[in-house]
Curated annotation (Swiss-Prot):
Keywords: Acyltransferase, Cell shape, Cell wall biogenesis/degradation, Cytoplasm, Magnesium, Metal-binding, Multifunctional enzyme, Nucleotidyltransferase, Peptidoglycan synthesis, Repeat, Transferase. It is an enzyme of class 2 (transferase). Residues 248-454 are annotated as: N-acetyltransferase. This is Bifunctional protein GlmU. Signal peptide: none annotated. Residues 227-247 are annotated as: Linker. The gene is glmU.
Amino acid sequence: MALNVVILAAGKGTRMRSDLPKVLHPIAHKSMVQHVIDTAHSIGSDAIQLVYGYGADKLKSALGEQQLNWMLQAEQLGTGHAVAQAIPNIDDNDTVLILYGDVPLIQASTLEALLAARPDHGVAILTVNLVNPTGYGRIVREQGKVVGIVEQKDANAEQLAINEINTGIMAVPGKALKTWLGRLSNNNAQGEYYLTDIIAMAHADGVEINTAQPQSAIEVEGANNRVQLAQLERAYQAREAEKLMIAGANLRDPSRIDIRGEVTVGMDVMVDVNVIFEGKVVIGNNVSIGAGAILIDCEIADNAEIKPYSIIEGAKLGVAASAGPFARLRPGAELMQDAHIGNFVEMKKAVLGVGSKAGHLAYLGDAQIGAGVNIGAGTITCNYDGANKHLTVIEDNVFVGSDTQLVAPVTIGKGATLGAGSTITRDVGEDELVITRVKQKHLTGWQRPVKIKK
């Protein structure tokens, strides 16, 4: 029995006041619908039917080449009509799970519980109890058993008093779903084909209907405007921050952190305020991350320190390495064990060896730097000739004086010393001292220019 997921994503989202289709608005730098797609994959879906309508080109461009079946809903005539567009790709023996592209916080564990609650040949619907259920369809029960769902505009006074509401998420047998969708009518206050009407049909056909509930109501909330989108963003961030704390991170203020990807942390990790994580970030034990740092697709080893306002992207920090404040590691950069870069040092496709240091104001690009090297302030590897990038090699225990330019390709041998202000254009041998600056001149009695009075 295959799990066939139908995701409804055809709406325009007029209240968003945007040209972007509603489901493409982001939560944690990922579109709402992509969150739903990822969750569907995580529970082992065999197929995903994406029902789309408004903004088709933008939707297809944003979602790219994914394992999706695109099912067009040319007219938005209700949720039942939307699901019906997926019928050509649904087999009789499928379990059909219906999800919504603007409900991004639904968790895999909740969907697994819903699927487990579905009886053989029966239906399972996800419900939640709200203090204020206004606007939602109500779950109608008789003697504890679900007999139907009534929408807000069609409900009588007794039904409006019901607090258990329909989330719209349900698991339905494929063959029965086809039959029930074929019976739908739009004879209601909205003039639409309600998916919810299939529940009364299931009851009338003697089909068993079970329910499940999420761990939190926020899982099933959608975003119809930017205020609700911001609320979902905060809820998502709170949930992700909680995961980090449970895993061993000490967050200085859990409400002032942004997690926009997959973060793995070790024990006793300290994270100060306003830190941003993006992509896949792996952090070891006893790591300290200062305020305002940005970590993107990087690996941080045990006991490393990232000082405030540093940007670490596509890079690695070794054991007890440190960066910052105001340092930038670009893709391909790596600090080996005990290596350090300080304020306003930038590295790209460069390795700084064990115990080596670049304390201030340097650019190290396309460079292999050995152990025990000191990089003076203002040092630049001149790696680009206007057409191609070239490699700088600095071997172990080299001392590079301040304001030195290394014009690549060039190799500096072990133990060499480069005098401050030098421009190095040729290879330097081991233990050599190289000074290329112009000889210092002393002009006695020099008279400074005097300003001319006007």
